[in-house]
Amino acid sequence: MENRRQGMVVYLHSLKQSKMLRKFGNVHYVSKRLKYVVLYCDMDQIEKTMDKIASYSFVKKVEPSYKPFLKLEFESKLDKAKEYDYKIGI
């Protein structure tokens, strides 16, 4: 059985405590310049985990990823300019 995962972005004041976030889920990426961590955890525990992480003093802001709720199948629409046949008169 596959667990549904959802990402979250944790903005930090300092990167010293970024290793501590490993206990909440999988740390996917740590940006040293912009001071944020991309973290993945189970979808059913995302709210509880976000509240717990936001309560720490070294955390500025926690934002969830909305990717699981977006439609990722796109329909191809033909371009209006390509739709017309310009070689009719020739």
Swiss-Prot record:
Keywords, comma-separated and alphabetical: Cytoplasm
Compartment(s) of residence: Cytoplasm
Bridged cysteine pairs (disulfide): none
Pfam family for this entry, one: DUF2129
Membrane spanning residue stretches: none
GO cellular component, one term: cytoplasm
Protein name: UPF0298 protein YlbG
Family: Belongs to the UPF0298 family.
